[in-house]
Amino acid sequence: MITHDELTDMMAARLSKGEDLDLIYTNPKNHIVCFIPTYEPGGDSTKCYFVDGREELVCLPMRIITRELAVQEGLRPNYIMTSDGRRSSYTSPKIYGPHLTFAHIKCRRPVGKDVVYGLFNVAIPYEYIVTEGPEPDTSYIHVGNFAPILVYQSPRHVKHKLNEAMLEHCNYVRKMLARIKLSQNPQVVAELFIAWRDLTR
């Protein structure tokens, strides 16, 4: 019979390897890879990329989409905290839940006060590959089977932002698992994971 500590350690090990995504990171079909601000249809819109390979254009500014996402995840949009409980600055990694930790990377030239930063989720089963862009201080981000995404920051800076977000994500998940461990009841652990998965579909 598996003990509570073994169960939690097993979940942590699988989490670190990216396994059992349906159990740990909600339904992969609806799992977000990134949000990219764009003017493609002539207005301020957002491209949404999903783990299952879908790419959808939403005719809403990214500011509205992230606000709605925060509310859906039960968060206060203007008070998203870091993994150590501090209020997150504008371009710091943003944690919306165990399945959503975003790195801010500049994706377009600024026009007025429109959002210029895309949000790249590091809690996904893909690795981001960063290559040189067509101009100095630009890069291409390659992920999954999507076309390369042009960003307006150097490869070194982009890698730093992605690593920073991954570190924040790991700290958050480690703390979440530590809190679950306090329950001393494997049944509670299982129910928490199942309930969380159902609520985040």
Language model segments and positions:
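Eukaryotic intrinsically disordered, low-complexity regulatory linkers and tails enriched in Ser/Thr/Pro
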Residues: 1-201
